[in-house]
């Protein structure tokens, strides 16, 4: 989906949860390949999280690939979806309290799985939204936009996106970093011996 002829949003199949939904291993790998291609080329990552159990032990390999191999953590916003299932979105105090707990949990799980530096912990971007509050549907919310803005907390995601762009040096720098990640993906796919290929990338292309 293109927005204002400048931004293209790509909703990928995701990297996790295939075992529950799909039993065809070839199809699972195809889905993952599609996702990995788009992710490696992305300027910013909106990482959608399950509100009840955001990050699992089984995610470790893919988290390492995303945030260590491709170095995408600084360009990632973690989005806790369907937060109206976890908090009273009409109660600011309850929302803030539960969001704080979830954010701390996400930081801890990431640290357990991929060992975050202090700088990464401080720079971790997490928001919690309710894209369809109370399940009332698009038609209703299009007629009640002001209420939607308040309850959905979509503005927190918009603000986090703008902040990420600034933190990463603006649009042009982000585009260059995305090219590096895409090249890493291509190179590692062609030369899958991980440690050696990483060494070659660092020595020859400064990535």
Tell what function each PLM region has.
Residues 1-167:
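Globular "head" domains of long coiled-coil molecular machines
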Residues 145-207:
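Extended helical scaffolds that flank P-loop GTPase cores
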């Amino acid at each position: 989906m293109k927005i204002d002829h400048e931004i293209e949003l790509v909703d990928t199949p995701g990297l996790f949860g295939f075992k529950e939904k799909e039993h065809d291993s070839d199809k699972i790998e195809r889905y993952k390949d599609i996702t990995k291609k788009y992710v490696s080329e992305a300027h910013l990552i909106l990482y959608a999280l399950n509100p009840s159990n955001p990050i699992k032990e089984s995610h470790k390999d893919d988290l390492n690939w995303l945030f260590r191999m491709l170095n995408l953590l600084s360009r990632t916003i973690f989005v806790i979806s369907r937060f109206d299932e976890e908090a009273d979105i009409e109660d600011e105090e309850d929302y803030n309290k539960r969001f704080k707990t979830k954010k701390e949990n996400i930081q801890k799980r990431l640290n357990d799985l991929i060992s975050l530096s202090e700088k990464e912990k401080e720079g971790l971007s997490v928001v919690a939204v309710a894209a369809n509050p109370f399940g009332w549907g698009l038609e209703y919310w299009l007629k009640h936009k002001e209420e939607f803005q308040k309850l959905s907390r979509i503005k927190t995601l918009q603000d986090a996106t703008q902040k990420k762009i600034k933190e990463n040096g603006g649009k042009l720098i982000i585009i260059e970093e995305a090219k590096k990640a895409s090249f890493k993906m291509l190179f590692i796919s062609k030369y899958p011996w991980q440690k050696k290929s990483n060494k070659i990338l660092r020595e020859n292309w400064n990535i």
